[in-house]
Amino acid sequence: MAPALVKHSIYTIENELRRINDRIVDNIRNTYIDISSIHGFGLFAKKPIQAGAILCELDGQKMDWGHYEKLRKTINLGEYQDYIFMEWNALDPKTLLVRAFRTKYSYINHSKTPNVEIKYSPIRIEAVKDIGEHDELVIDYSKEPLSEEYKTDKEKSFIQ
């Protein structure tokens, strides 16, 4: 009897981009995910975006930070862990707006010179500068009302 063939996928950037795009919620039109010079992958404009344009509204379920962390630690989704139940926005230092599925929003990298911002009532992403075609969308993570515990986490020191 011949040995069973085992499929092995070879990691390439192209394969990873394909995986990401197959598993992402496309909530920000006219953008695409690609390699970022800032960090890993980023979100880029397919065409120019004018300052003041609303890119998307963000939805989700409200929950306190502690409950979110407890749920996050107890849910094991294997290879899908990075695509489901990991995206949130801080509404205040104790409350999060959590999305069950990963969206394009999560690929907006941090910068102290952002070209998009989170606006509230309703919670949305808005361009604060003109953004050129193929420019990366960037946001200042520190502008969210983050908890002190989150801000002092050594892994989050890039936000300071």
Predicted regions span which residues?
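Conserved catalytic SET/PR domain of SAM-dependent protein methyltransferases, capturing the structural core
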Residues: 1-160
